[in-house]
Amino acid sequence: MCALSLAEDAMDTPADDPAAAEEAPAVQQSARDAFIDGIIETGRQLYVKANGKLQRAQYAGDIYVCKNFTVHVFRENCARFRMAEYPGVALKIPNNLPKEKCKPHSYGYCWEEVTAAEGNPFYIAAQFLYDSSLSKQENMEKALEFMRQVRRGDYFQMSAEYYYGVGAHSAIMIADYDPETDTVHWMDSNMAGEKRDGVRYGKVQFDAVKEISWWAEAFCKKTRGATIYRLRDDIILAEEPLPEEPLP
C-alpha cells in the first residue's frame, strides 16, 4: 500500500509508558484508503438522500442505474488521485465488456480491458466463471471461495440469475469478507426496484449484508460468472487535480 506518510515507531520507549502514547505521532491515512473512504461516503450520502424512496433508473444518464451508480461515486472522487506509476494520467473506470465480446459467457460478468497506462486504477483480484466440465457442487465451492476474497473498496461485477432478475449487476463492497458470519457488506443501486408506467425505479442500498452463499447462488449458473476489481496499491494524491471527464 502506498502511504502518503507513515509515523515512525517510538523504538526506545516502553509500550506501557503513558507518555509514549501521548507523544507518538498518528499514522496518516494512505491515499488509497482515502479514495475508498470517499467512494463509500459518496454512496452513503446518496443512500441518505434517497431516504428509502426508489430513484429513477431507466435512462443512460440516470445515476441510479446499477453500473452508473458505481461509476458516479468513482468519478465524484477520482480527480484527487493518481497512480504512482502514471502520475500524469487521470483515473478512469472501464465500461462493461460489450455483449458480443462476452461470448460464450453471458453479458455482465466483467469490464472492458483498459490498461493502467490508460488510466484504469483497478486490477482483477478474483474471478469466477461457471465451468460446465465440473459438477454443480464443485462450481459452488469455487464460487464460495471466490466470494471469500472480498475486501473493502472492491468493485463487484456479475452476470446473475436470482430473485431480483436476470442479467448484469454492479456493486461496491464496503467491508472485508467476514469469516465469522460468512457475510459481505455492500452498497449499490437498482438491485431491487419496480416499474412505474414503463419506467424503472431502483432502490439505493448501503451496508446491505448477505451470506456469501446468497451471492454465489446468484452467479453460479451456466454461462454466468463474476469478477472482483480492486484498486492498485500505488494510489497517490494528485499534485494538480484535473477536471472530471464528461459523461459519454
PLM region spans:
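...with weaker cross-activation on analogous glycine-rich loops/strands in unrelated enzymes
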Residues: 91-195
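Low-complexity, Gly/Ser/Thr/Pro-rich intrinsically disordered linker/tail segments
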Residues: 188-192, 198-248
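A detector of low-complexity, intrinsically disordered, Ser/Thr/Gly/Pro/Ala-rich segments
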Residues: 9-11, 181
